[in-house]
Amino acid sequence: MDSQGKKVVVCDNGTGFVKCGYAGSNFPEHIFPALVGRPIIRSTAKVGNIEIKDLMVGDEASELRSMLEVNYPMENGIVRNWDDMKHLWDYTFGPEKLNIDSRNCKILLTEPPMNPTKNREKIIEVMFETYQFSGVYIAIQAVLTLYAQGLLTGVVVDSGDGVTHICPVYEGFSLPHLTRRLDIAGRDITRYLIKLLLLRGYAFNHSADFETVRMMKEKLCYVGYNIEQEQKLALETTVLVESYTLPDGRVIKVGGERFGAPEALFQPHLINVEGVGVAELLFNTIQAADIDTRAEFYKHIVLSGGSTMYPGLPSRLERELKQLYLERVLKGDVDKLSKFKIRIEDPPRRKHMVFLGGAVLADIMKDKDNFWMTREEYQEKGTRVLEKLGVTVR
């Protein structure tokens, strides 16, 4: 709470999950899937102890997903369906989750870097007009990740469910001209895993199977350190084969798909996306930075978001960066490679890093009036109140 007794809420609206809670806390109060479902057939009124409603949100929708047509209001970090997004926020602020009176609260929201201004304007409009929060702040996710890690300078590789960003931050300011965006993230890897499983003869084609495959991905997938070696193992042996039990009791076997699906992060052409993979994008970003800041950036690469949780990802990233540096900067001179210092930080709680950073920032700033956009300012200026965010508060 701030000095006037107003609650300060932190809400990290991801493409796949909503993480919400309060300023100063060190873990989200609630984490639930960002999905909205509508029943396909109204044959039963109850399943177990959950009542089937015309509109199901979050955890409830996830549990009953086999009976629902499920929609994700956000795609690639951007709100695509505002009506469903409002249902998601109603659920977040309502009795099921935070149970707050939004008129007496301030809220810190997060957004991906390079988010369209239109999207931000609409968020502000909904927060002030529909929910009537007394103060709102929208923070850039990458900056919050660094705050949570106790850094002011570094490069954040943030890969969630909808979008992957590589965002250099210098002295607490994100550098938009160097920020790179890769529209491959968790959801695309899940889709690709569905495709690979189809080639093995397993069909997952209902909208609800998507969640099932996502859970399988989180349990079994990893990033291969040496892809040729992994492929050889997959073809010639059964060491990679794991059994997985589906919700309906069937057991399926998964092998080379375990490293094949996340490989799309490093080789986008596998899923028909143009451009370079995450390692080369990271290398290009740092090399495009001012020469005096490059060494700092290489030493402070911070991973963030659920799609960086694959075992093997940090070491693969480091291997590819060293390889690229050797080829393109040192022109193949191996002796000089020992001077090249690189450090990839993979904090264990990186799945919720953005929320944690938001909780820290909101707590520090809870009584600073020039930090928050207020309801009065919004009534006076409309969406021009966003100019207040143009200045990064340090």
Swiss-Prot record:
GO terms for biological process: Arp2/3 complex-mediated actin nucleation; positive regulation of double-strand break repair via homologous recombination; positive regulation of transcription by RNA polymerase II. SMART domains: ACTIN (SM00268). PROSITE patterns: ACTINS_ACT_LIKE. ATP binds at G160, D161, G162, R214, M215, M216, K217, E218, G305, G306, S307, T308, M309, Y310. Its main location: cytoplasm. GO terms for molecular function: actin binding; ATP binding. One of its GO terms (cellular component) is Arp2/3 protein complex. ATP-binding component of the Arp2/3 complex, a multiprotein complex that mediates actin polymerization upon stimulation by nucleation-promoting factor (NPF). The Arp2/3 complex mediates the formation of branched actin networks in the cytoplasm, providing the force for cell motility. Seems to contact the pointed end of the daughter actin filament. In addition to its role in the cytoplasmic cytoskeleton, the Arp2/3 complex also promotes actin polymerization in the nucleus, thereby regulating gene transcription and repair of damaged DNA. Component of the Arp2/3 complex composed of actr2/arp2, actr3/arp3, arpc1b, arpc2, arpc3, arpc4 and arpc5. This is Actin-related protein 2-A. The lineage of its organism: Eukaryota, Metazoa, Chordata, Craniata, Vertebrata.
